[in-house]
Amino acid sequence: MELPKETIEQLQNLFIAANRPEKEIREEATSKIQKFVKETPNSIITLLVFQNLKTIDAGARTLSAITFKNLVKDSWVDGDEVENPIPSNDKEMVKSLLLNFILSAVNNTTQSQLVESLSMIGVSDFPQQWPSILPELIKQMESNTDIPTLSIILRVLHSLLKKYRGQERNNQSLSELKYILSILPTPYLSLLIKTGVAVDANLQNEQQLVLLLNCVHFLLEIFFSMSSVDLPEFFEDNLASFTNEFHRYLKFNTNFQSIILSSNDEEPSLLKKIQTSICEIINLYTQIYDEEFSSFLQPFVQVVWGLLTQTSKDICNDPFVYASIRFLGTVATSISHKIFESPETLKQICSMIVTPNIELRESDIELYEDNHVEYMRRDIEGSDSDTRRRAAIELVKGLRKYYENQVIQLLSVDINNLLQKYNSNREENWICKDSAIFLVTALAVKSGGSDESSESSKLVNVLDFFKSSIEPELSGATQTNKPILKADCLKFITIFRNQIPAEEYPRILQSVIPCLENPDFIIHTYASTCIDRLLSVKDGGVPRLSAEFISTNLTGLLLPLVGVFNFKDSKQNERAMRTIVRIVLMTQGKVSQQITIQLLQKFVSIIIEEAKNPSNHSFNHYCFEVVGTLLKGFSSEPEVTQIIMPLIEMVLQTNNAEFSPYCFQLLSILVENCRPEYLDLFRPILPIIFNDMTWARDADYPALVRLLQAFIKKEGSSIAPHLSAILGITEKLIMRVTHDHEAFLILETVVETLDIQFLEKYLGGIFSMILTRITKKKTLKVVRCFTIFFSIFMIKYGVVKTAQTVRAIKDSLWEDILIKLWLPTVEDINGSIEKKIISISLTNMICCNDILATPELWIKLIQCQSNVISGKKSQETEQAGAASDLYIDQAEANEGYVPTFTQLQFSKKVDVDPFPTISNPKEYFISTFQTFKSQNEMLVTPLLSTANIQL
């Protein structure tokens, strides 16, 4: 495909402008690029071809490749939420071009973007909708003698197959792999062996050896992917050949620094990457295919053990150390666990592998001092999953499966030795106590993670260790000033909080609260987390620290927590804020208006400061959660409103994209609970709501809709002059597949609130608007929303009026809606209020003489009502319910932060029953129907018999 010269120039200019430092120029160009992508036919092909042109600007090429990748990510898979799906012809063209463009890519950056794109396409299309790609890759793999090109081919193959890692073993994955394994393994093994021969032949050729070993690395990654779901029969039959190749690289020796040394302090060397991949493979086979692999296991254990004891403590070796220790841990729990059964072997594992890899390194201490956020992530947030410490702890857990008593005895000796060494010189040997705490944790924990409450082993006395080694450290009795130890102790309490008796909790709090005033980021953050977790512990559903206890000690808890934000590094400490959220929730309704006002003033001031430069989105969310929760209790008080309004005004005036969804929610709470005499304060907001610019951001839609609903309900008939503007908003929303349900929320509120005379002139337009949307893009969601709205309309204004309104648009439309849309959907409606609405509307139709005049329709309605009130589903409805499972919201990762609506979980709008006078829809039906039947006995009784309904 050849691009017109003007298209090339247009795109080049746009992409160059989109890379400019000037914000206005950059944003305008980005907007035009997005418009081009959405509105130009074949835009995905144009982008792909454009980035492959040799003459274009390098920055434009890169941005074009990124735009192509993002378009694939957002629009390749069809679905209700995809507003601009890619035509199937364009998809086929992309798939026919992509591999060649990857191989001919001008630079590594664009090549990487294209490989990522291919991987995403492969997730949905390979192999069923893309059968040509694998034979083409195999052909290239077998015929290509150029090692750099072969490396690219293997990289592509790896990206295509990695989707099977972690995939469930089901019919689809097995069917796909059956096809793949029918054509790939033989040429794959041939290439693996051939590459091994080439490696041996080039032991003195550094440049060629590096290229070959890069290929080996991809080959190993491919092997892992092909083995992840099920053991391929070919692999099982040829395990001897494969394991010979694995041993080749585990035993590989060379002096070439480009192979054995890393390019930086954190990146593993090429050889270590290969050996890590092998450890991951043999771990997988030991874990899942242990019977088939057991005869090959012993030599791997020996060689991996040997490599592990020879590997330095450098950070760059951590992935290998983790993978190798994990492999040994898997062996310890496998059918081959007797490899470790001798006391001497267990002793060596504990003393030579576990304890040394538990020990803090200088790099860990530097991380604590220089990058406390990253240290915390590794230590308590689970991102330490591939560290030496984590691997050592997992190895201990694995060994305990068969050798718990022996391992506890062996490591208890190490723990005592470490504590003795610490006590002999606490200043010099404090790392020993850190190791001891970690070892006790490794021995004591039976389940749970590093940041969660854990079940503990009965063979380890957690409470004794807490009293002898943890509590004194926190209380200051040990007279050491090592912040890492204090952090360890706080984490220990957090992990074993369930094992510490309830009567200890008040004293623990007295030791933990002072840590909130420690300027060390880790310490006051861990203290916040510790308090949060202690507050969460319940016995028989009852919190150990009751709401009454918290209320009594509210000032002593909240003031130090709020004080955390005064520290330079903790102005946005989300863990402290999360703890405050929990306390505010626990004490909801128990805090006086005076304290509420003081807290609101504090948190509103924090948000106003944050609004100047929002950066920590989680912190900001928690802060708004606190304000929203506090606001609920006293939202009708003018003094409270006066505190909140300056924040709302500032956010609206500065057009703060991140905070506006929150502020509209706060406004909604104020309006929903406003006393009539104070409503004038909020009426100036209405013109803002009706301004098109207010609806410029999707993120604001849900909160704006809630706010508009609040005004409609509060104003009642006074809102009628604004109906045209309100319906203009609903028309905009209803045409958006992601926001159509919000249009119906507005329409339902209008119908529930206003009498028919206010709506009369708009009714035809409302139904035409809805039906136009359904005709253009019919989805289950929009039909369900319409079904609920239609039911509310009938209940409020009557069945006859509804029929007249719809027939005024088209005479046959009433029956068409009921038979083709409404009836097939009603039984698939979920939610107690929604089901009640459906049942009431069915009752009203069944008991309507106009409906009775159409016997076939009446029979369908009575059968449907029978199913609704009995809880049954028709066959069609069950099928529709299964189909609805396909409509899954996909949260896409964005390039950079894009504000999205974030619901304040603890200030949600409560679902309100629009028809509270009817408490039981079944009883309502029975009583209403009996009256109707008695008046129409001659007509109803035969129809009931025909419908096979007994009432």
UniProtKB/Swiss-Prot annotation:
Protein's GO biological process: protein export from nucleus; protein import into nucleus
A GO molecular-function annotation: nuclear export signal receptor activity
Domain of life: Eukaryota
The keyword Protein transport appears for this protein: yes
InterPro entries noted in UniProt: ARM-like (IPR011989), ARM-type_fold (IPR016024), Importin-beta_N (IPR001494), XPO2_C (IPR005043), XPO2_central (IPR013713)
An example Gene Ontology CC term for this record: nuclear envelope
UniProt cross-references to SMART domains, sorted A to Z: IBN_N (SM00913)
The entry's keywords: Cytoplasm, Nucleus, Protein transport, Transport
Primary site of residence: cytoplasm
Domain Importin N-terminal intervals: 29-104
Annotated compartments: Cytoplasm; Nucleus
Function: Export receptor for importin alpha. Mediates importin-alpha re-export from the nucleus to the cytoplasm after import substrates have been released into the nucleoplasm.
Similarity annotation: Belongs to the XPO2/CSE1 family.
Protein known as: Exportin-2
